[in-house]
């Protein structure tokens, strides 16, 4: 998407006009204009010069934005609130002339305030003074007239057109009255003079401009606050870096740093670009990027990101990503792109904004004609028409959605939750089913030692020492868990392994002095050592908890079991509970076998588990789930891309510095599952805010325009002075923007106010295991089986056993050589044995 800066827009009608003009350019596939940031996002093959010309032909200005990181500062300058100081200056100057004008025009009539003697009784002079003050105020606020009439001539009237027409009509009619009064004065017709004196609308013309300026200033200040998050991100970009050239440290501009350059960072300095530490260690404060305030320890080989703060050590790093490729630049681009897109809910407001101003002008003209036809004076009819013009506000409609999107997106970015588009921010909260990938999402993705069970006579330290000596020569992921546990226990044993042998998928063996040691699964160890029944039961207990039991033996004697598991993240159960409290069905996807999957699922508290799903099979599962309701898929983005893309909403968790995950609609920079319900809360709060804004914008115009037209005058005697209409218009947009700013106070991690949406989704037809029901089992038997070699063997034995009447479930493991059979009715050992052996496997024992 190419980004453009657009100038000259003042209201929603302007942005609608620009969007329509650019969308009609050949080669443009999509165009989205943001009145809030005065920016435009364009997709397609059209040349930028053609796009800029289309904008200029529509009566506005445009220029293409730069994309380099060094432009972050200039982009921040583009977002700087330059409008408020200008409007403030105009307002103060206008008030200097408006106050005496109001004193002269209304003070003596309404409150009997004294007027200067030179003007007392001199009605023509009084009119001329009002004419002078009003003319000065109109010159001060000439922007309304230049923009308004220019847009009118381009056949694209906007809010400024309404203001300009209303003020100009008041001014023109008052000038006519002044001439008529002068003529009456010359003919000594004092009754006519007094009548004309009360028909001046100079104060209305001036007050309309001043009040609209007040509203514009309040709106500009509020709009400036909505982009604070984006501006603060842009200002984080470091301006310089210290690089090493010819063994000397040289400070250079950030744009001069290239990939592969070596740079240094001292304590208290920010990392200039993304890189890898090649020397030194430190703790980095990454709160600017992830929202996590606790410093993260970094050592040689670890990645560092631009804009993070080096709190302690001296670091020497190699630049890996510079310019627009840094994490910070990608975040800025993502927030900017989201601001440039439009949520589906904005389409109604956009359609209304496109025809709003012409419709209002027609209503104003019709109002005047109707009042003249029913016999009212021209002055009365004109006042009603002017009131219609100045009370109508297309800006409130146009700002209702983008201000909420900008604030919501900024809030998310502060907490490491990145919504790529306005659509993703709106739609995430509508999720009915959440599919969670197990590894890296519910669990940490890093196996850890959870239990150590030494046999009698062996200490935990002795067991861990032998396991450490054996496993340190292995490359298996489970071996790393044992090595980490040994390091934590400060075991630095000098036991040396000789004749090391690794049997793929089974275990390890080697010699320590004259003793042979073994480590591996139950089936492997049984070949070399007798395993007591108590230890077999313990291993089954551990397996039922979702853990992998590793057996260790020394010279035909079992010395113990070490259980390893990919442990559940600390916040996962609470996050799942929060999702369920929101009325969302939570499904876990995993490639694990049923027993392990169900154990993890129970710990996490999910509604359903789908086990045995390979990475390539996740996409088809998501397709099935989508038939039941709106699905969000949460994964780490590494092997989940097809599933993330297939889901209604793809959420990549734990992205860290790699936020450019194309398949994801929402990117969570931290690995906390609790950020998923937080993202849904923020989405729901933003959508609610948009609904409030749209309601206010529509109801304001629906009530205000008939009131201004005098619809209630004949019945209740209500009529609206144009000045009060202008005051209402000036406050309408301010109210909308201020309401959106309330999102800054929203606590997205607070679950106390969660509302449970009505969810009629039923998942029974999908091949899932419902783990929330208490399973009633009258008997359980464990069969030891030889001959099973793979998953197909497991499936064959499982299918055979579960075909028996009375067998409710059979959990089969070829690695452990066991089948745990759950029965609701008694099934004899002979029947179980015969059933398995008919499949060419051997049953050695049943317990």
Language-model features and meaning:
Residues 1-127, 223, 248-249, 333-341, ...:
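Flexible metal-binding regulatory segments at protein termini and peripheral loops
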Residues 16, 29, 267, 431, ...:
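Conserved ATP-binding TGD loop and adjacent catalytic N/P-domain core of P-type ATPases
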Residues 25-49, 53, 199-200, 231-325, ...:
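Conserved cytosolic catalytic loops of P-type ATPases
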Residues 86-240, 351, 452, 717-722, ...:
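Transmembrane helix-loop-helix hairpins at the membrane interface
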Residues 87-89, 308, 432-436, 442-475, ...:
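ATP-driven catalytic headpiece of P-type ATPases
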Residues 110-124, 153, 172, 411, ...:
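Membrane-embedded alpha-helical bundles of multi-pass transporters
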Residues 181, 190-192, 206-267, 298, ...:
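Juxtamembrane coupling segments of multi-pass membrane pumps/enzymes
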Residues 289, 348, 383, 396-470, ...:
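Conserved catalytic phosphorylation-site environment of P-type ATPases
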């Amino acid at each position: 998407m190419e980004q453009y800066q657009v100038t000259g827009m003042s209201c929603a009608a302007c942005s609608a006009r620009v969007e329509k003009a650019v969308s009609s350019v050949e080669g443009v596939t999509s165009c989205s204009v943001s009145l809030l940031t005065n920016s435009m996002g364009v997709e397609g093959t059209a040349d930028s010069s053609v796009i800029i010309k289309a904008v200029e032909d529509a009566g506005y200005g445009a220029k293409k934005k730069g994309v380099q990181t060094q432009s972050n500062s200039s982009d921040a300058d583009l977002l700087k609130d330059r409008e408020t100081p200008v409007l403030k200056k105009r307002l103060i100057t206008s008030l200097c002339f408006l106050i005496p004008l109001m004193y002269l025009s209304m003070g003596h009539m309404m409150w009997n305030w004294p007027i200067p003697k030179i003007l007392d009784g001199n009605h023509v002079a009084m009119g001329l003074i009002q004419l002078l003050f009003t003319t000065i105020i109109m010159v001060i606020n000439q922007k309304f007239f230049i923009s308004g009439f220019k847009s009118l001539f381009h056949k694209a009237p906007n809010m400024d057109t309404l203001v300009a027409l209303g003020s100009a009509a008041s001014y023109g009619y008052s000038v006519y009255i002044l001439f008529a009064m002068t003529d009456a004065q010359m003919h000594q017709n004092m009754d006519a003079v007094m009548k004309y004196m009360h028909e001046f609308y100079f104060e209305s013309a001036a007050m309309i401009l001043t009040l609209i300026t007040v509203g514009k200033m309040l709106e500009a200040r509020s709009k400036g606050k909505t982009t604070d998050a984006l501006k603060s991100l842009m200002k984080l970009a470091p301006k310089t870096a210290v690089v090493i050239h010819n063994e000397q440290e040289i400070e250079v501009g950030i744009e001069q740093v290239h990939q592969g350059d070596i740079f240094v960072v001292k304590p208290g300095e920010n990392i200039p670009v993304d890189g890898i530490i090649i020397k030194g260690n430190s703790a980095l404060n990454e709160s600017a990027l992830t929202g996590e305030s606790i410093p993260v320890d970094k050592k040689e080989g670890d990645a560092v990101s631009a804009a993070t703060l080096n709190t302690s050590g001296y670091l020497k790093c190699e630049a890996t990503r510079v310019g627009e490729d840094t994490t910070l630049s990608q975040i800025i681009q993502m927030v900017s792109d989201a601001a440039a897109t439009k949520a589906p809910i904005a389409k109604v407001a956009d359609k209304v904004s496109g025809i709003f101003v012409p419709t209002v002008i027609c209503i104003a003209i019709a109002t005047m004609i109707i009042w003249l036809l029913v016999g009212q004076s021209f002055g009365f009819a004109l006042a009603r028409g002017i009131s219609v013009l100045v009370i109508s506000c297309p800006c409130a409609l146009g700002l209702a959605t983008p201000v909420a999107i900008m604030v919501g997106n900024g809030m998310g970015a502060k907490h490491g939750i990145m919504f790529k588009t306005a659509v993703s921010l709106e739609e995430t909260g509508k999720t009915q089913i959440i599919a969670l990938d197990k590894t890296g999402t519910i669990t940490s993705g890093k196996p850890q030692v959870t239990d150590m069970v030494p046999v009698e006579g062996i200490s935990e330290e002795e067991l861990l020492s032998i396991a450490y000596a054996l496993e340190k020569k292995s490359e298996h992921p489970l071996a790393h868990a044992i090595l980490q546990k040994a390091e934590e226990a400060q075991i630095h044993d000098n036991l040396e392994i000789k004749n090391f042998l690794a049997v793929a998928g089974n275990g390890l063996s080697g010699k320590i002095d004259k003793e042979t040691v073994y480590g591996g699964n139950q089936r492997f160890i049984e070949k070399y050592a007798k395993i007591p029944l108590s230890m077999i039961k313990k291993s089954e207990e551990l397996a039922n908890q979702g853990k992998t039991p590793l057996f260790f033996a020394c010279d035909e004697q079992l010395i113990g079991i070490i259980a390893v598991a990919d442990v559940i993240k600390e916040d996962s159960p609470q996050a799942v509970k929060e999702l369920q409290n929101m009325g969302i069905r939570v499904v876990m996807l995993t490639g694990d076998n049923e027993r392990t999957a169900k154990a993890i699922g129970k710990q996490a508290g999910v509604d359903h588990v789908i086990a045995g799903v390979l990475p390539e099979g996740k996409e088809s599962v998501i397709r099935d789930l989508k038939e039941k309701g709106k699905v969000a898929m949460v994964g780490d983005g590494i092997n989940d891309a097809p599933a993330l893309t297939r889901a209604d909403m793809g959420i990549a968790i734990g992205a860290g510095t790699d936020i450019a995950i194309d398949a994801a609609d929402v990117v969570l920079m931290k690995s906390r599952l609790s950020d998923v319900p937080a993202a849904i809360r923020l989405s729901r709060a933003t959508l609610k805010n948009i609904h409030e804004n749209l309601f206010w914008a529509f109801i304001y115009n629906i009530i205000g325009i008939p009131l201004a037209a005098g619809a209630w005058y004949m019945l209740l005697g209500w009529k609206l002075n144009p000045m009060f209409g202008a005051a209402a218009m000036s406050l309408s947009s301010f109210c909308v923007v201020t309401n959106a700013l309330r999102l800054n106070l929203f606590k997205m991690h607070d679950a106390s106010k969660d509302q449970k949406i009505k969810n009629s989704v039923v998942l029974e037809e999908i091949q899932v295991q419902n783990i929330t029901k208490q399973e009633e089992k009258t008997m359980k038997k464990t069969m030891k089986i030889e001959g099973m070699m793979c998953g197909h063997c497991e499936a064959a034995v499982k299918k055979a056993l579960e075909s028996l009447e009375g067998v409710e479930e059979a959990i089969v493991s070829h690695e452990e050589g066991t089948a745990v059979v759950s029965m609701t009715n008694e099934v004899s050992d002979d029947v179980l044995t015969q059933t398995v052996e008919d499949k060419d496997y051997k049953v050695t024992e049943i317990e």
